[in-house]
Amino acid sequence: MLGMDRSLGIDLGTVSVLIYQKGKGIVLQEPSVVSILRDSGKVLAVGEEAKNMLGKTPGNIIAIQPMKSGVIADYEITEKMLSYFIRKVCGDSKVFRPQVVICVPSGGTEVEKRAVLEATMQAGARKAYLIEEPIAAAIGAGLDISEPYGNMIVNVGGGTSDIAVISLGGIVVSESLRVAGNNFDEDIIKYIKEKYSLMIGEKSAETLKIEIGTAMELKEELFADIRGRDLVSGLPKSISVGSNEILEAISNSLKTIIEGIKIVMEKIPPELAADIADKGIIITGGGGLLRNFDQLLSKITGVPAYLAEKPISCVALGAGKVLDNIHVLKSGLISMYK
């Protein structure tokens, strides 16, 4: 136990938290959800157990998602959640506290970044460093970002979409959007409610997105059955929904992400544009798993787009790889506040 390296790379996401432990790889992946007692604020459950309570809790229990659009919405609950996950990975020792590299969206303000660092320190870190998500995602996707060549990353998470061109270890141009996978779910809920007068929950919307969601119209449409509450009768009801309906539902959110990608591409310096055209766009993040999202990007931009090998884990893996080369702090790859 004394010889264990407690260095951690943390992807503190809106939807889930992933933790990389040096020498072990990804050791934790759990939802960013905390259940508390309304009156006392006592934490009842964290992660998967708390997520299972979403929408099902009695009046005295609240299930909270403390991260919104990639930033801390509830500082105290975020700190408790981080503390729980760090203890789960490293144990309760107050002597051997971990060194942590934690990821933040590229568009975060200094106040938002400071909040993440302070929450990480309060949660039990010995030292805390920041790395911007596109850089972590690029490293985690296996790109060599230290070379004088352009690499383009589109990281579509749960709460934010980060689009960036990276060269010589830093971000040359970027755009951070607070539109991502969660917005797809919200779009689907709204669409089903308006078209079918049926109320469905977040889990049901996510299931539809995963099973039949698509970024481009399919030649052979997919269908899925979904259950919800009929807003007219108040009774449970089941309907069949098609993939092209899901595309219609999420089209505005998709358009926002595509516009963000276009903005970045218009700002790419000419000397790096040829690199992007040659190597293509790398897609990371859970939102990038949307069916045909890579094909849509290729069609719109005229540049090949590829889904990373482990899109959901890329950010945490990148933070972990930085742990193995922590000396890169000196080159400014990571902002160190504490």
Please provide the spans of the model-predicted regions.
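Nucleotide/phosphate-binding catalytic cleft detector across ATP-hydrolyzing
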Residues: 1-156, 164-282, 288-338
